[in-house]
Swiss-Prot record:
UniProt record similarity statement: Belongs to the rotavirus NSP3 family.
Organism name: Rotavirus A (strain RVA/Human/Japan/S2/1980/G2P1B[4])
Cell compartment(s), UniProt: Host cytoplasm
Protein name per its UniProtKB record: Non-structural protein 3
Keyword NAD among record annotations: no
Family annotation (Pfam families): Rota_NSP3
Length: 313
C-alpha cells in the first residue's frame, strides 16, 4: 500500500521557506541600512541560529510529529491521533500548557513586548492586497470572541488627529537605486575585466612554458639521438680495435699460451657498454705493463749476474 507523507512534506517545505524568508529579511534589512555584508556569512549565521532555535525550542519536532500523526490517520492508522487527542484533553497537559503560556508572557514582557502589543497582535492580522500598496486589517477569532463577550468598547474621548504622511519621492529613490546599480555594475565589470586580464596572462605564460618544454624536449631528443650514434660509433671502434689487436697478435712470434691468454682477455671486453669496455682496456693495459715490468726485472737480474751494465738511450 502506498504511504502518504504529503503532510510531512508540506511541513518540511514550510520550515525551509521560513528559513529562506529569514535570510531574505536579514539581507534586505542590511541593504536598506546601507551595511555591506557577505551573503555567505549571513546565510551561514542565519542557518546556524535558525536550526538552533527550531531544534532547541522543539518547534520543528512538534510540527513534524503532528504532520506524521495526520499522515498516519490518512493511511488508516488512528492510534497515534487517539493518543494525541487523549493527551490534549488531559488536565495535566492543560495545566502544563497554561504554565508554558504564563512563562512566555513573562518572557515577552521582559523583552519589552507589553500586554497592549500582545493583545493587539493576537486580535488583528494584516492582509496585503495583491497589486496595491494598501492592506486589509482582519479580525482574528479572539477578536470575534471578545466582541461576543462584550469585551470591546468604543473610546468616546478619542480625538481624531491629523496624521502627517511623508510623501515618498519615488523618483529620487529610483535614481538612488539606479546609481547603486550602476556602481555595482561598474565594480563587477572591473573585477571581471581584471579576471580576464589575469586569465590571459596565465594562458600566455602556460603557452610560453609549453613552448619551452617542447623546445627542451626536442633538444633532449636530439641529444638522445646523438648519444645513441656516439655509443654505436664507440662500439664499432672498440670492435675494430679488438680485431686489429687480434690480427697483430697473430703476426707476433709469441708462444701459443701467451697468445691464447691475451685473446681471452680481448674477448672478455664488453662491446655493448663503452664505459665497461674502457675499464676492460685499462685492466688489459695494467696486466701488460705488469708483465713488462716483471720481464724487465728478470732481464735486469740476468745482466747483474753476468756483470753487465745497462743504459737507457
Amino acid at each position: 500500500m502506498l504511504k502518504m507523507e504529503s503532510t510531512q512534506q508540506m511541513a518540511s517545505s514550510i520550515i525551509n521557506s521560513s528559513f529562506e524568508a529569514a535570510v531574505v529579511a536579514a539581507t534586505s534589512t542590511l541593504e536598506l541600512m546601507g551595511i555591506q555584508y557577505d551573503y555567505n556569512e549571513v546565510y551561514t549565521r542565519v542557518k546556524s541560529k535558525f536550526d538552533f532555535v527550531m531544534d532547541d525550542s522543539g518547534v520543528e519536532n512538534n510540527l513534524m510529529g503532528k504532520a506524521a500523526t495526520i499522515d498516519q490517520a490518512l493511511n488508516g492508522k488512528f492510534s497515534s491521533s487517539i493518543r494525541n487527542r487523549n493527551w490534549m484533553t488531559d488536565s495535566k497537559t492543560v495545566a502544563r500548557l497554561d504554565e508554558d503560556v504564563n512563562k512566555l508572557r513573562l518572557l515577552l514582557s521582559s523583552k519589552g513586548i507589553d500586554q497592549k502589543m500582545r493583545v493587539l497582535n493576537a486580535c488583528f492580522s494584516v492582509k496585503r492586497v495583491p497589486g496595491k500598496s494598501s492592506s486589509v486589517i482582519k479580525c482574528t477569532r479572539l477578536m470575534k470572541e471578545k466582541i461576543e463577550r462584550g469585551e470591546v468598547e468604543v473610546d468616546d474621548t478619542f480625538i481624531e488627529e491629523r496624521m502627517e504622511i511623508d510623501t515618498i519621492d519615488w523618483k529620487s529613490r529610483y535614481d538612488q537605486l539606479e546609481r547603486r546599480f550602476e556602481s555595482l555594475k561598474q565594480r563587477v565589470n572591473e573585477k571581471y575585466n581584471n579576471w580576464v586580464i589575469k586569465a590571459r596572462k596565465v594562458n600566455e605564460n602556460m603557452n610560453s612554458l609549453q613552448n619551452v618544454i617542447s623546445q627542451q624536449q626536442a633538444h633532449i631528443n636530439e641529444l638522445q639521438i646523438y648519444n645513441n650514434k656516439l655509443e654505436r660509433d664507440l662500439q664499432s671502434k672498440i670492435g675494430s680495435v679488438i680485431s686489429s689487436i687480434e690480427w697483430y697478435l697473430r703476426s707476433m712470434e709469441l708462444s701459443d699460451d701467451i697468445k691464447s691468454d691475451i685473446e681471452q682477455q680481448l674477448n672478455s671486453i664488453d662491446l655493448i657498454n663503452p664505459v665497461n669496455a674502457f675499464d676492460d682496456f685499462e685492466s688489459i693495459l695494467r696486466n701488460l705493463i705488469s708483465d713488462y715490468d716483471r720481464i724487465f726485472i728478470m732481464f735486469k737480474g740476468l745482466l747483474q749476474q753476468s756483470n753487465y751494465t745497462y743504459t737507457y738511450e
